[in-house]
């Protein structure tokens, strides 16, 4: 074998060994899709499809199991090691970035859907009318957001969140007892809808984050007094990340089963793709522009660094998000990519990423804006400039309120449609392709969070380094003072000449 060939082979083997997990994860996505399409011809029963998806279900369980301890330990340990000024700077930088990129994503989506015009009334005739949709109120949703930010019971927030539900109520008393009124009462004509604030299952991520931020900042203000408590959360954070690394080696098999099972679940794949092809092209084009042009441009302008080199280090997180369709479930892998591959300070990642996984939903905001205007187009409704602005603002706010769980975009979509008076039931028409779009927009959400962490780190690196130098100086001074005190104590314990003479 020639020397050059042998060297190239060694380099390739070395690269594969170093990036084995990444290679396995990418292969699992490709093989999962391929096997899914090949097995569609067998027309497997729902029970058999469930068995195929089961290893993927276990992966989701394992990743979600890590979310609560990871958010608590990462946020508290990260903020506790910063002073209040640094925490405020990190927070303001992160929120500014989140709001700006979300607005850019929405504008991109609206521009494309108006130019491409994927919606046509004939599509609705082919697909049929939608099923009855849920009632939803923008005001009630915003109130729920605030209620969830400040939970009345922190323990309850770990497994339940507040949600306004709407129930039909039949009047118990009527003014007129004539036959017409009684008939209307019996057939439900006098029924009215009443809003009821209830608890639904699912972790209140926003409430947990707000509570952990408060605890972290309070611990940082206590200083040395809270040292033991801070170390507890730092060590807990390291333990969770060690567990995550173990789970990551199972993730390729889990993602393979998730993708294959999801493709097998879809009915009439070819017909759905044909009828909603232009809608999918519009959404995917918007997501591609946002992830390959807008975000890299923002990153380059703010940091003067090559964004594509930075994105290469995030590939593992991007692929995992594609497989799991959950920003929160991908959070541990995103931590690992930023800290190990790209050298971002853990104090930045531990604060910026958990918040970003909850409120920064660029892909979701873009998708909601496109879907809302697409539904208007298939209903033959022409939206005025004011209504388009309303769509953009509502899509931005709705994406912030979206929980970082699979298909949350469909739920918040109801807000956008209600805001401009479009039929809510037509959301069901685009559900058929949401399984694919959900995965891709989630991967864009994760990419946006990670690039935000990189930008925040760029602007806060000098402050963090200065804080570290000050802490090191203070620690050295403290050690010197303790040594001096020990020497003085030893000197004072020695007997004097008079004491020696007396003895």
UniProtKB/Swiss-Prot annotation:
Subcellular location: Membrane
InterPro entries noted in UniProt: DAACS, Na-dicarboxylate_symporter, Na-dicarboxylate_symporter_CS, Na:dicarbo_symporter_sf
UniProt keyword Transmembrane, yes or no: yes
Transmembrane segments: 19-39, 59-79, 96-116, 199-219, 239-259, 281-301, 369-389, 400-420
Cytoplasmic-side positions: 1-18
Lipid bilayer topology: Multi-pass membrane protein
Residues bearing glycans: 177, 187
Pfam name, any one: SDF
GO cellular component, one term: cell projection
PROSITE patterns: NA_DICARBOXYL_SYMP_1, NA_DICARBOXYL_SYMP_2
Family: Belongs to the dicarboxylate/amino acid:cation symporter (DAACS) (TC 2.A.23) family.
PANTHER family on file: EXCITATORY AMINO ACID TRANSPORTER (PTHR11958:SF110), SODIUM/DICARBOXYLATE SYMPORTER-RELATED (PTHR11958)
Name of the featured protein: Excitatory amino acid transporter
Source organism of the structure: Caenorhabditis elegans
Gene: glt-1
């Amino acid at each position: 074998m020639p020397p050059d060939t042998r060297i190239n082979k060694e380099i390739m083997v070395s690269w594969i060994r170093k990036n084995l997990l990444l290679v396995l994860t990418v292969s699992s996505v490709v093989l999962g899709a391929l096997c899914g399409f090949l097995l569609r011809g067998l027309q497997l029963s729902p029970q058999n499809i469930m068995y195929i998806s089961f290893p993927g279900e276990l992966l989701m369980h394992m990743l979600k199991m890590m979310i609560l301890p990871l958010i608590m330990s990462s946020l508290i340990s990260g903020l506790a090691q910063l002073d209040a000024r640094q925490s405020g700077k990190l927070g303001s930088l992160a929120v500014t970035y989140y709001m700006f990129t979300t607005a850019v994503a929405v504008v991109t989506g609206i521009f494309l859907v108006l130019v491409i015009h994927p919606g046509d009334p004939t599509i609705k005739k082919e697909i049929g009318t939608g099923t009855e949709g849920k009632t939803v109120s923008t005001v009630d949703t915003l109130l729920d957001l605030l209620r969830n930010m400040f939970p009345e019971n922190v323990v309850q927030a770990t497994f339940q969140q507040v949600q306004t539900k709407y129930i039909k109520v039949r009047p118990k008393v009527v003014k007129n007892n004539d036959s017409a009124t009684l008939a209307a009462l019996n057939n439900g004509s006098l029924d009215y809808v009443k809003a009821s604030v209830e608890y639904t299952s699912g972790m209140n991520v926003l409430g947990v984050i707000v509570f952990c931020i408060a605890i972290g900042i309070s611990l940082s203000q206590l200083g040395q007094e809270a040292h033991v408590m801070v170390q507890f959360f730092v060590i807990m954070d390291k333990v969770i990340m060690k567990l995550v690394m173990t789970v990551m080696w199972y993730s390729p098999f889990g993602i393979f089963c998730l993708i294959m099972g999801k493709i097998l679940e879809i009915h009439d794949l070819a017909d759905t793709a044909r009828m909603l092809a232009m809608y999918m092209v519009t959404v995917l084009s918007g997501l591609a522009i946002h992830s390959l042009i807008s975000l890299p441009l923002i990153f380059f302008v703010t940091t003067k660094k090559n964004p594509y080199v930075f994105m290469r280090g995030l590939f593992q997180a991007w692929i995992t998000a594609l497989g799991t369709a959950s920003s929160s479930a991908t959070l541990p892998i995103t931590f690992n990519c930023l800290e190990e591959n790209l050298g971002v300070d853990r104090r930045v990642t531990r604060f910026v990423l958990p918040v970003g996984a909850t409120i920064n939903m660029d892909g979701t905001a873009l998708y909601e804006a496109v879907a809302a205007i697409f539904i208007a187009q298939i209903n033959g409704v022409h939206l005025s400039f004011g209504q388009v602005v309303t769509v953009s603002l509502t899509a931005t706010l709705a994406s912030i309120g979206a929980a970082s769980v699979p298909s949350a975009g469909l739920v918040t979509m109801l807000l956008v449609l209600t805001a401009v008076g479009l039929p809510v039931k037509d959301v069901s028409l685009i559900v058929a392709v949401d399984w694919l779009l959900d995965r891709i927009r989630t991967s864009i959400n994760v990419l946006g969070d990670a690039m935000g962490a990189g930008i925040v780190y760029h602007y806060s690196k000098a402050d963090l380094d200065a804080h570290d130098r000050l802490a090191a100086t203070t620690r050295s001074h403290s050690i010197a003072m303790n040594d001096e005190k020990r020497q003085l104590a030893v000197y004072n314990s020695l007997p004097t000449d008079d004491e020696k003479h007396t003895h």
